[in-house]
């Protein structure tokens, strides 16, 4: 079986973790290789460029090779390359950014437009280069081995891929043909392909010339119509993909309501299995991670929940407004928090308040869920409704409702935690095996 991902993003990682945890194994393949794939994840680009099984470390930001007298200026977010007063390039870090490991470098022309992007891998060498035209459209992308030899050239205007492998040139009309060549070399069983994208992975499955039992895992929202490629699968009785697993509850119900009964049978729902990193001890320690001083009803909550302790952290300096809360006995502030202190807060706190305005910081809701924090949010600040109980998302106009919930929490926290695991997108190994067990491990 092949588990085929377009990108190894958060949702792909969640699906892969859920499958492996459930004992549903396959050869995981990622099409868009960013150079930092885990060792157990395959990629045709890594294979042909001989990146698999190598040793080395990511390139640190100040190790980028430069001409004489050029310099690098950086912080924990990004870095820039300067030629005296001229900015020549911008360095983007691999997550987590505080480690300052180089992932991509945009090199500018004299008009301050990106001329090309160098892509670095987890071994510290430039494994690919993307070229842009004057309108900033991608034209070609070249992939290299460790010695800088060009191995693959992909033309984004024509779709053609040229592979130089074992002193021979191979030409492919598109990525599907390229992937099929790679699969044939690997000798994998192609009778089952599980995939989570309606782009290249869909076409790999759709154009297979022999029978198989494939599954599409749909992880996105939909608008007012079902995507065309998904409709092709649902309306056909002879494609390899006869099952669509939707991984967002609301999207599942929406899609199902738009289908005739015979097509509804092809749709199923399955969330994700999330790690369970610690037991909740019912402590009255509340954690908030923010990049803003706009925290909904913070003053009221601190005043009325005096028997709770608020731990408020930020990766940056805090404003005077937020620092003023240091005078409160039940508040501890952590400006410029270190990773060690942040990890400790996940351990010592058992409640998370998602009440800060602005962007979610560092996927904190997901991490709080994994650490079994009971999560509460206001309706105008909730950053991840898939992991928060509906009953714990409070109207921002009724702060007293949250206060009352917290004052009466001690006897129900374990029950609510159980509900948080059962009624959100969290799944169990048993349900994964029940839904997918008949399809997997071929």
Swiss-Prot record:
* Annotated GO biological process: protein O-linked glycosylation via serine; regulation of protein stability
For this UniProt record, the keywords arranged alphabetically read as follows:
Cell membrane, Membrane
Query: Where does it localize?
Result: Cell membrane
Observed phenotype of the null mutant: No glycosylation of serine-rich repeat protein Srr-2.
Family to which the UniProt record says this protein belongs: Belongs to the GtfB family.
In its keyword annotation, does this UniProt entry include Membrane?
A: yes
Q: Which domain of life is it from?
A: Bacteria
Write out the GO cellular component annotations: plasma membrane; protein N-acetylglucosaminyltransferase complex
* HAMAP family found in the cross-reference section: GtfB
Membrane topology type, per the record? Peripheral membrane protein
Lineage, uppermost ranks: Bacteria, Bacillati, Bacillota, Bacilli, Lactobacillales
Function, please? Required for the polymorphic O-glycosylation of the serine-rich repeat protein Srr2. A stabilizing protein that is part of the accessory SecA2/SecY2 system specifically required to export serine-rich repeat proteins, probably Srr2 in this organism. The GtfA-GtfB (Gtf1-Gtf2 in this bacteria) complex adds GlcNAc from UDP-GlcNAc to Srr2 substrate, attaching the first sugar residue. Stabilizes the glycosylation activity of GtfA in vivo.
Q: How does it assemble?
A: Interacts with glycosyltransferase GtfA (Gtf1). Interacts with glycosyltransferase GtfA; probably forms a heterotetramer with 2 subunits each of GtfA and GtfB. Part of the accessory SecA2/SecY2 protein translocation apparatus.
- Name recorded for this polypeptide: UDP-N-acetylglucosamine--peptide N-acetylglucosaminyltransferase stabilizing protein GtfB
Q: In which pathway does it act?
A: Protein modification; protein glycosylation
Q: Which InterPro entries match?
A: GtfB
């Amino acid at each position: 079986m092949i588990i085929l991902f377009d990108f190894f993003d958060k949702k792909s990682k969640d699906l892969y973790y859920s499958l492996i945890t459930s004992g549903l194994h396959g050869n995981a393949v990622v099409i868009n290789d960013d150079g930092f794939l885990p060792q157990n994840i395959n990629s045709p680009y890594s294979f042909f460029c001989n990146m698999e099984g190598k040793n080395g470390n990511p390139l640190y930001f100040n190790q980028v090779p430069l001409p004489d007298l050029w310099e690098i200026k950086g912080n924990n977010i990004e870095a820039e390359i300067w030629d005296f007063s001229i900015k020549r390039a911008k360095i983007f870090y691999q997550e987590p950014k505080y480690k300052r490991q180089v992932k991509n470098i945009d090199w500018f022309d004299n008009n301050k437009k990106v001329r090309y992007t160098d892509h670095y891998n987890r071994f510290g060498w430039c494994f690919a280069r993307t070229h842009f035209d004057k309108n900033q459209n991608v034209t070609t992308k070249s992939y290299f081995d460790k010695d800088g030899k060009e191995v693959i050239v992909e033309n984004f205007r024509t779709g053609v891929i040229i592979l130089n492998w074992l002193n021979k040139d191979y030409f492919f009309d598109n990525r599907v043909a390229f992937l099929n060549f790679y699969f044939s070399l690997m000798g994998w069983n192609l009778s089952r392909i599980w995939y989570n994208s309606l782009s290249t992975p869909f076409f790999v499955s759709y154009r297979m010339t022999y029978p198989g039992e494939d599954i599409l895992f749909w992880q996105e929202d939909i608008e007012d119509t079902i995507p065309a490629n998904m409709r092709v699968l649902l309306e056909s009785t002879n494609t390899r993909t006869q099952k669509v697993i939707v991984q967002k509850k609301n999207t599942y119900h929406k899609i199902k309501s738009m289908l005739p009964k015979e097509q509804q049978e092809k749709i199923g729902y399955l969330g994700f299995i999330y790690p369970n990193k610690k037991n909740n001890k019912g402590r009255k320690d509340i954690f908030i991670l923010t990049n803003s001083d706009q925290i909904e009803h913070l003053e009221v909550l601190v005043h009325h929940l005096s028997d709770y302790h608020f731990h408020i952290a930020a990766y940056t300096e805090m404003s005077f407004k937020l620092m003023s809360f240091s005078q409160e006995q039940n508040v501890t502030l952590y400006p410029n928090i270190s990773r060690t202190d942040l990890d400790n807060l996940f351990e010592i706190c058992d409640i998370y308040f998602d009440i800060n305005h602005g962007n979610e910081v560092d996927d904190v809701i997901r991490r709080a869920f994994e650490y079994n924090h009971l999560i509460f949010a206001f309706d105008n600040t909730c950053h991840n409704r898939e992991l928060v109980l509906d009953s714990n998302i409070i109207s921002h106009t009724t702060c007293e409702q949250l206060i009352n919930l917290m004052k009466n929490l001690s006897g129900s926290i374990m029950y609510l935690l159980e509900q948080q695991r059962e009624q959100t997108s969290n799944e169990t190994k048993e349900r994964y095996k029940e839904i997918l067990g008949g399809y997997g491990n071929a």
